[in-house]
């Protein structure tokens, strides 16, 4: 009695608890029973349970043709195994398959049925009854589909270690073996799928997406893993929403508004088709287009979403699909289904009715109930499922499945169906291992084997964990330690078929889980059709891409993906799009105009090839040529008076120094090297000091001689050539010492200056010591200042005495140039520093060359008549007479004042300003050299009393004159000189006698004081000039003239053979001087 009571309790638990009727299952007896859980319907009808009566099981609605095909795949695999002699011979597999209706509650009802039929040791029911012979055990379960459903089922089956092999549940939570002890699956883990989604977004350079997930154990873990992967790739999520097929309208409206207001174009969805369908319907109703949907494998090929009327919203969807498999003979098996023939499949009747939209009457042989009315059914908006009640015609039973397009018959890509097929074969191979196990080699204690006829579920689970077999496609099948079967994904794109207008899934790439990171994803972009039938990759970024040359700048308060593009600063670059930072260019490089790369900095110096450098070089060469030309002219005409009058040896040295000055400017042109930097400043400084020293010595020599009170041979000897060269050497040696100290202590060197301008490297000379450079230039300016002082002081001396006036001008030019050089040098940089110094050198050099030598070259080449000894004598005598005239006038003024003080008449005082004018007549023949000077000075009365002889008259008529007119304000002094050939006769002896008598007299006339200097400028004759003053009070006397010692350096004396007349008029008095030489 107890035995029967126990059996009835278990049967009640099995049948009444599950509340499944005969037409809500597919079952077949066998030696070993396999359980199956499939979503034959998408959901259940909402029904209020007020508990006023016994609660009934909820009704399943919205038929799932794919779910029925998956069920058919399990039946096909079992029948194929039963008919195979190689696998489980002499054993028959049976099945019990239930509809989960895609809900946890229905799945648990079916699971309780599986559990109740097993021997439950934990309940200790064996003491009361043994029903195992009457109710066969379910040793494994295939299913379920959704991860949420499988999670609930796994929790229950895991309590009894009943193996569960899922074909579509990919949640990564199910890999936890501590919680789900008996769960295995033939589908990859969602962890790889989430990574693949992030890789696709990174591939298309999207960084601004939205996420939607099903509010279950599939959607939440999947989207969480995606967030982790997105964060690693700097992908920002604009919004994240949870949905469910049971969400109320308000929740759906909220999610739709979020999508509509979002700027993200790409939406990642981890959900199943039934959970996503209400949201898609509302989006279609609002006509929200332009979004790119990234679908997980749970809905990537869902018939609920992939409907033509939704294509304008979901067209272009990129989704993941499991790798398609091949099931030989499965196509024909699907076509054989018929409600009257498929006696073991209780779902065939409803399938037939939903396929042909008709109503089947129960036949005599069929198990179908007899209904006297036409059934209505809720359908899901299409011909197979709608929300309205419609009356259906009777089915004839002769309908052809091939004539109707349904997802059931779409076997082109067998993905989930193949996973079901593989799950059944996995269990079969585990049973085969038990069947073929040899004692001692088993997996159990002491190598024992399980008895195939009394096999238990936990034993099958043990063998499934160690399963390893080759499937019909030649692939190795094995479960890892987490019970997962690692596999690859196909990437599909939703297209609209041009033939029938249905949505087709085009394979556009794949994702290889086994490949290395970065090589897992392959996409053929040419095959992708985006939303709106566009071939262009859509833009889904919070900010536009920052092009090369810019970097991403953070916007405060915004996600990291929302940024502004900031141009790279000068000296930095970015050569990639969306660079997070700019790279700094190397030291000798600078960023280009677009900051996309680094280019070598421009090297800048005063080059030989640039126009400015060429111009300066030409001027320097011109200066060298002109200086060489002047030197050549001076050498060629070295014996002419004008060359001799300029102290030709010093002139040669001066011209050589000018050549050095012009040449030194060339060291400042070209790329600076260490040796040129060390050479150019000393070369410039020494050359200019040598030049100025020559001018200084020449000018000072003349000044000292003219200022001497009693010029004697001491002055001539002191200012000899040797001493002059010695002074030039000493002045130059000081500059050499400065340069040597400079080069020894802090030598200049070439320097690459990158601080002045960012884009240019200025190759300049680092002077080493600015103090040394200051000493060099300061010493040069000091000598120039002294030279200018002496030249200015001697500016009124005779022109032929080194042209002091022109030297003054040259020194003025020199100072103007170098004073202008200082601010210009200080305010310029780079190559212009060298250019300024070159210009200063050339300007100063040209000034010295032009002022000192060009006038002489002009006279030598174009006015040879002035390049005579007579012209030199005239100039010298003119200066002497001007000095004498001043002295005479001063004495006249003194006598007048003295007479006025004694009561005499007074006259006006002449002005102190004096001007002179000289006129030279025909050139004189050059006199022969005289060894003895024979001047003669006669008084005015003697000149009038002594008659002239005929030769003297002729000579007086022919001899040339040099006239001078001196103006003293209100007074005028006019004098004239004439020169004649010296005669070695009695007349010369008589003149000598008169000269001796005149030398005995004491005279203070200034003319006599300058007389010894006359030979310094005269070429080859001696000069004898005596002026006797009459009509003036006071004694008349003169100093004795020293002898000429050096005939080459000192010119011979002149013989004055005509009268010298001075007319001095001042106020009411006139002073006349006549000097007659014959």
UniProtKB/Swiss-Prot annotation:
Reported effect, residue 820 to F: In HYPOC1; the concentration-response curve of the mutant receptor is left-shifted and its EC(50) is significantly lower than that of the wild-type
Region: Disordered, residue numbers: 892-963, 986-1006, 1030-1055
Annotated phenotype, changing residue 489 to F: Reduced calcium-induced G-protein-coupled receptor activity
Chain's gene name: CASR
Name of one Pfam family that matches: ANF_receptor
Effect ascribed to mutating residue 339 to T: Mutation found in a patient with primary hyperparathyroidism detected at adulthood; inactivating mutation; mutant CASR is activated by a higher calcium concentrations than the wild-type
Protein name as catalogued: Extracellular calcium-sensing receptor
Result when mutating residue 136 to L: In HYPOC1; increased G-protein coupled receptor signaling pathway; does not affect cell membrane localization
Region feature Intracellular loop 2 (ICL2), mapped onto this chain: 699-722
């Amino acid at each position: 009695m107890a035995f029967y009571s126990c059996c009835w309790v278990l049967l009640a638990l099995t049948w009444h608890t599950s509340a499944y009727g005969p037409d809500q299952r597919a079952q077949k007896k066998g030696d070993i029973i396999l359980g199956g859980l499939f979503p034959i319907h998408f959901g259940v009808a909402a029904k209020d349970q007020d508990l006023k009566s016994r609660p009934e099981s909820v009704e399943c609605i919205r038929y799932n043709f794919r779910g029925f095909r998956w069920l058919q795949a399990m039946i096909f695999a079992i029948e194929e195994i039963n008919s195979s002699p190689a696998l489980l011979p002499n054993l028959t597999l049976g099945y019990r398959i239930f509809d989960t209706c895609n809900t946890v509650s229905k799945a648990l009802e079916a699971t309780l049925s599986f559990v109740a039929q097993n021997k439950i040791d934990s309940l200790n029911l064996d003491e009361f009854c043994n029903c195992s012979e009457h109710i066969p055990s379910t040793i494994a379960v295939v299913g379920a589909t959704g991860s949420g459903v499988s999670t609930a089922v796994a929790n229950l089956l895991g309590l009894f270690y009943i193996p569960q092999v899922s074909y579509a549940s990919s949640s990564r939570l199910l890999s936890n073996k501590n919680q789900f002890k008996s769960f295995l699956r033939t589908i990859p883990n969602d962890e790889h799928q989430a990574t693949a989604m992030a890789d696709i977004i990174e591939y298309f350079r999207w960084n601004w997406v939205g996420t939607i997930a099903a509010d279950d154990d599939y959607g939440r873990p999947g989207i969480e893993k995606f967030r982790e992967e997105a964060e690693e790739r700097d992908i920002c999520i604009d919004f994240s929403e949870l949905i469910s097929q049971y969400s109320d309208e308000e929740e759906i409206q909220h999610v739709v508004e979020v999508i509509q207001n979002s700027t993200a174009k790409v939406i990642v969805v981890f959900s199943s088709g039934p959970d996503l369908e209400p949201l898609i319907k509302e989006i279609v109703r609002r006509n929200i287009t332009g979004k790119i949907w990234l679908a997980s494998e749970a809905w990537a090929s869902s018939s609920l979403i992939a409907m033509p009327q939704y294509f304008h919203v979901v067209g272009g969807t990129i989704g993941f699909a499991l790798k398609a498999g091949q099931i030989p003979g499965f196509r024909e098996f699907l076509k054989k289904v018929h409600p009257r023939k498929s006696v073991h499949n209780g779902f065939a009747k409803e399938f037939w009715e939903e396929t042909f939209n008709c109503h089947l009457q129960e036949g005599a042989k069929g198990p179908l109930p007899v209904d006297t009315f036409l059934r209505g059914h809720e359908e899901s908006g299409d011909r197979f499922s709608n929300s309205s009640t419609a009356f259906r015609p009777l089915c004839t039973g002769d309908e052809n499945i091939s004539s109707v397009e349904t997802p059931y018959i779409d076997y082109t890509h067998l993905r989930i169906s193949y996973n079901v097929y593989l799950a059944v074969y996995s269990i079969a191979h585990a049973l085969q291992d038990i069947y073929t196990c040899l004692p001692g080699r088993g997996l159990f204690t002491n190598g024992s084997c399980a008895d195939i006829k009394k096999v238990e579920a936990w034993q099958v689970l043990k063998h499934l964990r160690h399963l390893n077999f080759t499937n019909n496609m030649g692939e190795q099948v094995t479960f890892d330690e987490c019970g997962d079967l690692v596999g690859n994904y196909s990437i599909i794109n939703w297209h609209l078929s041009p033939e029938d207008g249905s949505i087709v899934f085009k394979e556009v790439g794949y994702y290889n889980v086994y490949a290395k990171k970065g090589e897992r994803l392959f996409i053929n972009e040419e095959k992708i059709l985006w939303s709106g039938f566009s071939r262009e990759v859509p833009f889904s970024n919070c900010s536009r891409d920052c092009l090369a040359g810019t970097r991403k700048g953070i916007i405060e308060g915004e996600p990291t993906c929302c940024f502004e593009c900031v141009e790279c600063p000068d000296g930095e670059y970015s050569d990639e799009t969306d660079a997070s930072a700019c790279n700094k260019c190397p030291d000798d490089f600078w960023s280009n105009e677009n900051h996309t790369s680094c280019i070598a900095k421009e090297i800048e110096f005063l080059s030989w090839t640039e126009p400015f450098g060429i111009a300066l070089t030409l001027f320097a060469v011109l200066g060298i040529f002109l200086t060489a030309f002047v030197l050549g002219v001076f050498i060629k005409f070295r014996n002419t008076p004008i060359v001799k009058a300029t102290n030709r040896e010093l002139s040669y040295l001066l011209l050589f120094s000018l050549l050095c000055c012009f040449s030194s400017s060339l060291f400042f042109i070209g790329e600076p090297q260490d040796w040129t930097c060390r050479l150019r400043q000393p070369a410039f400084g020494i050359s200019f000091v040598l030049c100025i020293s020559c001018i200084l010595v020449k000018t000072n020599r003349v000044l000292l001689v003219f200022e001497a009170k009693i010029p004697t041979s001491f002055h001539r000897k002191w200012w000899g050539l040797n001493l002059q060269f010695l002074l030039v050497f000493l002045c130059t040696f000081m500059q050499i010492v400065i340069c040597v100290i400079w080069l020894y202590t802090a030598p200049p060197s070439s320097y690459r200056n990158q601080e002045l301008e960012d884009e240019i490297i200025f190759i300049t000379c680092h002077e080493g010591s600015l103090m040394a450079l200051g000493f060099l230039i300061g010493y040069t300016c000091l000598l120039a200042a002294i030279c200018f002082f002496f030249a200015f002081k001697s500016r009124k001396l005779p022109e032929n005495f080194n042209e002091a006036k022109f030297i003054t001008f040259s020194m003025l030019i020199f100072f103007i140039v170098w004073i202008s050089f200082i601010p210009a040098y200080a305010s310029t940089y780079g190559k212009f520093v060298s250019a300024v110094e070159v210009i200063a050198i050339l300007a100063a050099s040209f000034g010295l060359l032009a002022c000192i030598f060009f006038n002489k070259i002009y006279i030598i080449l174009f006015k040879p008549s002035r390049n005579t000894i007579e012209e030199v004598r005239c100039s010298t005598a003119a200066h002497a007479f001007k000095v004498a005239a001043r002295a005479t006038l001063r004495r006249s003024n003194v006598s007048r004042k003295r007479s006025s003080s004694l009561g005499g008449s007074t006259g006006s005082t002449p002005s102190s300003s004096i001007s002179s004018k000289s006129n030279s007549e025909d050139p004189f023949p050059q006199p022969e050299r005289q060894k003895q000077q024979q001047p003669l000075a006669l008084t005015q009365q003697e000149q009038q009393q002594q008659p002239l002889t005929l030769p003297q008259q002729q000579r007086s008529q022919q001899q040339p004159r040099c006239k001078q007119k001196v103006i003293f304000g209100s007074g005028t002094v006019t004098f004239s000189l004439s020169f004649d050939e010296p005669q070695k006769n009695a007349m010369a002896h008589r003149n000598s006698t008169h000269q001796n008598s005149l030398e005995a007299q004491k005279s203070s006339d200034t003319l006599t004081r300058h007389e010894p200097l006359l030979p310094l400028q005269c070429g080859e004759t001696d000069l004898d000039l005596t002026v006797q003053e009459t009509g003036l009070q006071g004694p008349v006397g003169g100093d004795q003239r020293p002898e000429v010692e050096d005939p080459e350096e000192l010119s011979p004396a002149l013989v004055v053979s005509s009268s010298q007349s001075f007319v001095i008029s001042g106020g009411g008095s006139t002073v006349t001087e006549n000097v007659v030489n014959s």
